């Protein structure tokens, strides 16, 4: 019993410490207004706000997952927190994307992401990985024309971690960028972290929830930054 209490105390202290690293609220939305606020942007999205939550919906026959995003002044170190649930087995996955639309060296200004499925969390560096436009890498990847060396390089730009998330259950996801490291926790428990140069991009200015395809619900979304001098 004492060891369990001690472990709980350590976890609570760790969570408090992590929260203290990102004390400044950049944006938050609890979706209580039953409508998207004016700061929300969208791309090929059929998502709606209803019953106090964001219901992620990719329109039928769309060629791109639904994107619902928030823009802000660019920063390097950020924390995104969101409650989510996979409603049915139609919910394939969702992504938390960090982008810089002013950056022209990667497709769509993609910098890094955390991709969540019911069984897997994948962390990736898009800036220097699969979305890198340098030398035509992104186009060759789309056309399935990568060399063996390029495939090996791209394999170093992502890292996967197993999870087990039951359908219908609500969970709290926290994604943090700190320097060149991307870290994820779910329900207060660490899932994994990944270091790669592109993650350290110092002007992340857009965060997106990308739903593939439907039946992902979101609530209590926030973006936080580190304290400013």
Language-model region placement:
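Short tryptophan-centered beta-strand motifs in secreted/extracellular beta-sheet-rich domains
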Residues: 31, 80-82, 169-184
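Beta-strand-rich interaction surfaces with strong enrichment in secreted/lumenal proteins
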Residues: 66-72, 159-165, 207-208
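Ligand-recognition surfaces built from glycine- and aromatic
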Residues: 199-229
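Short, solvent-exposed beta-strand-to-loop segments that form ligand-recognition rims
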Residues: 187-204
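Short carbohydrate-recognition loop motifs
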Residues: 46-64
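Extracellular carbohydrate-recognition regions
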Residues: 20-42
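Secretory/extracellular carbohydrate-interaction modules
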Residues: 60-141
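Short, aromatic/His-centered strand-loop micro-motif at the edge of beta-sheets
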Residues: 134-172
């Amino acid at each position: 019993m004492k060891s369990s209490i001690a472990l709980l105390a350590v976890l609570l202290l760790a969570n408090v410490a992590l929260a203290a690293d990102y004390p400044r609220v950049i944006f938050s939305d609890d979706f209580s207004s039953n409508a998207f606020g004016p700061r929300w942007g969208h791309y090929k999205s059929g998502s709606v706000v209803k019953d106090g939550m964001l219901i992620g919906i990719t329109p039928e026959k769309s060629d791109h997952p639904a994107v619902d995003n928030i823009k802000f002044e660019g920063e390097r170190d950020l924390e995104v927190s969101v409650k989510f649930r996979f409603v049915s087995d139609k919910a394939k996955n969702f992504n938390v994307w960090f982008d810089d639309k002013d950056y022209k060296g990667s497709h769509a200004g993609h910098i890094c992401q955390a991709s969540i499925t019911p069984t897997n969390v994948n962390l990736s560096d898009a800036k220097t990985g699969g979305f890198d436009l340098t030398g035509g890498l992104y186009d060759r990847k789309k056309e399935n024309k990568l060399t063996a060396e390029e495939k090996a390089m791209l394999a170093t730009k992502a890292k996967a971690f197993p999870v087990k998330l039951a359908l219908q259950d609500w969970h709290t996801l926290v994604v943090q960028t700190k320097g060149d490291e991307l870290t994820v926790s779910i329900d207060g428990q660490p899932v994994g972290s990944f270091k790669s140069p592109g993650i350290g991009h110092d002007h992340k200015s857009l965060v997106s929830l990308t739903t593939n395809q439907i039946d992902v619900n979101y609530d209590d979304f926030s973006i936080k930054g580190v304290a400013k001098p």
